[in-house]
């Protein structure tokens, strides 16, 4: 495991219980999206991974090493293998792009003759080799974040922490940054933890996700699994799943999830013909994830109980996930 958080508790001096019994693992090469509402504990969690925050109790292991047991110099060295980017970039305004990236190497005591070539390599990686003499005030938000990404990768980390790294960007720039991170992850075989409150970020970038609410991890799994079958109420809210279509006049309203090959099959049409039952399609959409597409339909079966039951058994036999929406 690249990251292991074990039985983490975080209680601040004012008594606020920010994290409660958190256990979390990150495998090599995974991109984990940590999503939740404001105040849920997301930023506290990510800052524990590189010990910018220290837990009240529990263990923080990165590549098998308990960071909480390291001496200050040992911790400083370990942090060099953990890159981090933030919402507001944290660039040095008095230094140009080249100098901002080089600064991370100078702190790590790289040899001067190696710094120049490394900075050029990093700026080429993030597409800013033509901006090396620009200052932060001359850059767009997306360009500033690209500089921050280059700086975070300076010391060849195997883990990248992203704390709301796209929250200050517009949707087009967000897409470009996520595309960049996805490409970098593949090229460098990075593991990434990405804190966000935007479900679109998780859909576009991540293969794993966890949902945090009131300091607790309430759901954890692959993005595909959770989008297909969310369990917790907070997860359903974040995914935009509501029960407004279910009412007391009609209890036969269902949400059907279509995965992979089923997306192109005329399943509802076949069901209608086979069981002579009317189906009212209330809503539908397709989510494009990093691993595969997932389709959703909210339908009402307009038949008697026996007909509806046969239709449900047919859908279940096909391996579809069917959830009855409650009022």
From Swiss-Prot:
Lineage of the species this protein comes from: Bacteria, Pseudomonadati, Campylobacterota, Epsilonproteobacteria, Campylobacterales
Q: What is this protein called?
A: Methionine import ATP-binding protein MetN
ATP-binding in keyword set: yes
Query: How the protein sits in the membrane?
Result: Peripheral membrane protein
According to the entry, every stretch annotated as the ABC transporter domain falls at 3-239
Listed binding positions for ATP are: 36-43
Q: According to its UniProt record, which reaction does this protein catalyse?
A: L-methionine(out) + ATP + H2O = L-methionine(in) + ADP + phosphate + H(+); D-methionine(out) + ATP + H2O = D-methionine(in) + ADP + phosphate + H(+)
Principal location class: membrane
Assembly and binders: The complex is composed of two ATP-binding proteins (MetN), two transmembrane proteins (MetI) and a solute-binding protein (MetQ).
Keywords linked to the UniProt accession:
Amino-acid transport, ATP-binding, Cell inner membrane, Cell membrane, Membrane, Nucleotide-binding, Translocase, Transport
Classification via Pfam families: ABC_tran (PF00005), NIL (PF09383)
Q: Where in the cell is it found?
A: Cell inner membrane
Repressor recorded as keyword:
no
**UniProt GO cellular component terms:** plasma membrane
What EC class is this?
Answer: translocase
Give the E.C. number(s): 7.4.2.11
Similarity-based family:
Belongs to the ABC transporter superfamily. Methionine importer (TC 3.A.1.24) family.
Q: What does the record give under GO molecular function?
A: ABC-type D-methionine transporter activity; ATP binding; ATP hydrolysis activity
Q: Which Gene3D superfamilies match?
A: 3.30.70.260, P-loop containing nucleotide triphosphate hydrolases
State the SMART domains in the record. AAA, NIL
Species this chain originates from: Helicobacter pylori (strain ATCC 700392 / 26695) (Campylobacter pylori)
Q: What does this protein do?
A: Part of the ABC transporter complex MetNIQ involved in methionine import. Responsible for energy coupling to the transport system.
């Amino acid at each position: 495991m690249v990251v292991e958080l074990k039985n983490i508790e975080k209680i601040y001096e004012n008594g606020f219980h920010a994290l409660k019994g958190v256990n979390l693992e990150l495998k090599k090469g995974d991109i984990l999206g940590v999503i939740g509402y404001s105040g849920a504990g997301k930023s506290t969690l990510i800052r524990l991974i590189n010990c910018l925050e220290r837990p009240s109790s529990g263990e923080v292991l990165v590549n098998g090493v308990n960071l909480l047991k390291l001496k200050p110099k040992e911790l400083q060295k370990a942090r060099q293998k953990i890159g981090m980017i933030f919402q507001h970039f944290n660039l040095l305004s008095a230094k140009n792009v080249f100098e901002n990236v080089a600064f991370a190497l100078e702190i790590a005591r790289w040899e001067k003759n190696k710094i120049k070539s490394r900075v050029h390599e990093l700026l080429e990686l993030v597409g800013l080799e033509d901006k090396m003499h620009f200052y932060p005030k001359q850059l767009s938000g997306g360009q500033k974040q690209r500089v921050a990404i280059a700086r975070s990768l300076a010391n060849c980390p195997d883990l990248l922490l992203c704390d709301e790294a796209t929250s200050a960007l517009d949707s087009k720039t967000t897409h470009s940054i996520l595309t960049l991170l996805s490409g970098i992850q593949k090229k460098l075989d990075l593991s990434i933890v990405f804190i966000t409150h935007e479900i679109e970020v998780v859909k576009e970038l991540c293969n794993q996700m966890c949902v945090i609410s009131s300091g607790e991890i309430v759901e954890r799994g692959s993005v595909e699994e959770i989008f297909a079958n969310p369990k917790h109420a907070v997860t359903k809210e974040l995914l935009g799943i509501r029960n407004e279509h279910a009412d007391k006049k009609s209890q036969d309203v269902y949400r059907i999830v279509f995965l992979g090959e089923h997306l192109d099959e005329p399943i509802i049409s076949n069901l209608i013909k086979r069981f002579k039952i009317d189906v009212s399609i209330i809503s539908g959409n397709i989510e494009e994830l990093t691993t595969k597409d997932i389709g959703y339909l909210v339908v009402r079966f307009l038949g008697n109980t026996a007909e509806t039951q046969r239709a449900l058994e047919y859908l279940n036999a096909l391996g579809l996930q069917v959830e009855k929406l409650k009022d």
